């Protein structure tokens, strides 16, 4: 519970669905979303280019692609509701955009959990200049 409170305090200044996404990540992985995923590999965090470094980074690549398929939505600022049923993330009722954004975030949080065993600390705070190649196609 203490960790949840600390993450919530850290995310107070975060806009829109990034808050919900962070809470999903915490719930699925037990990891602090800011320190564990914000600057991981070539795709976790702002932007992205090159080849994903591992399965966790590929989760972020797929998440970026998912957001890219929502041209009429604002994934980083539109808020949505979700809850958990028997431990599973369930996106709540909302607009079409809110539901699709929630589903993108849900899939990424689950992907992070499924790849916890291969999470590699050498990719935390990974330098952007090492991600030189053109981005893969979604």
Swiss-Prot record:
Ca(2+) binds at residues 43, 45, 47, 64. GO terms for biological process: arachidonate secretion; lipid catabolic process; negative regulation of T cell proliferation; phospholipid metabolic process. It comes from Vipera ammodytes ammodytes. The lineage of its organism: Eukaryota, Metazoa, Chordata, Craniata, Vertebrata. This is Basic phospholipase A2 ammodytoxin A. The record marks 18-19, 34-35, 39, 46, 76-77, 79, 82, 124-125, 129 as: Putative membrane binding site. GO terms for cellular component: extracellular region. Disulfide bonds join 42-131, 44-60, 59-111, 65-138, 66-104, 73-97, 91-102. Changing residue 114 to N: Is 3-fold less toxic (by intraperitoneal injection) than wild-type AtxA (by intravenous injection), has 1.6-fold higher enzymatic activity, has 2.8-fold lower binding affinity for CaM, and has similar binding affinity for bovine brain receptor.
């Amino acid at each position: 519970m203490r960790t949840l409170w600390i993450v919530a305090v850290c995310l107070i200044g975060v806009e829109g669905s990034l808050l919900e996404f962070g809470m999903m990540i915490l719930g699925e992985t037990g990891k602090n979303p800011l320190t564990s995923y914000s600057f991981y590999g070539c795709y976790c965090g702002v932007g992205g280019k090159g080849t994903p470094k591992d399965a966790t980074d590929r989760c972020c690549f797929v998440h970026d692609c998912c957001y890219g398929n929502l041209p009429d939505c604002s994934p980083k600022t539109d808020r949505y509701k979700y809850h958990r049923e028997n431990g599973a993330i369930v996106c709540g009722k909302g607009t079409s955009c809110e539901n699709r954004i929630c589903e993108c975030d849900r899939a990424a949080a689950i992907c992070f959990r499924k790849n916890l065993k291969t999470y590699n600390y050498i990719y935390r705070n990974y330098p952007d200049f090492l991600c030189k190649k053109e981005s893969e196609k979604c």
